[in-house]
Amino acid sequence: MTQESTMNDIYPLAALLIYATNQKVTKEKISSVFKFLGLESHPKICEFFEVDAVEIKKLLMSSTQEAAAPAGPQEPAEASGDAGKKEEVEEEEIEIDFGMF
């Protein structure tokens, strides 16, 4: 991994760390986490990760929710009112002579 990609991975982790301590996630707090770690932070990138606690909770919960089951095919209702009657199609059996016997 390059140093730049490692740095970009720290921003969301810093935001989650601040959220986990029940504090409001601000760019100042993110930059203070970087200062504590002895790293340089960019204020513009810190602004991208400045998120409300409700939004962070939505993000965390959306990744753990189960996907909705797909809806099954719906049969159209019969307009004639003969719901109890079904037309039976008779299949004809055709004998095929292959001339073997």
From Swiss-Prot:
Chain positions covered by the region annotation Disordered? 65-101
- Could you tell me the superkingdom of the organism this chain comes from? Eukaryota
Q: Where is the composition biased (Acidic residues)?
A: 89-101
Please note every region of biased composition (Low complexity): 65-79
What is the protein's name according to its record?
Uncharacterized protein ECU10_1070
Q: Which organism is it from?
A: Encephalitozoon cuniculi (strain GB-M1)
Taxonomic lineage per UniProt?
Eukaryota, Fungi, Fungi incertae sedis, Microsporidia, Unikaryonidae
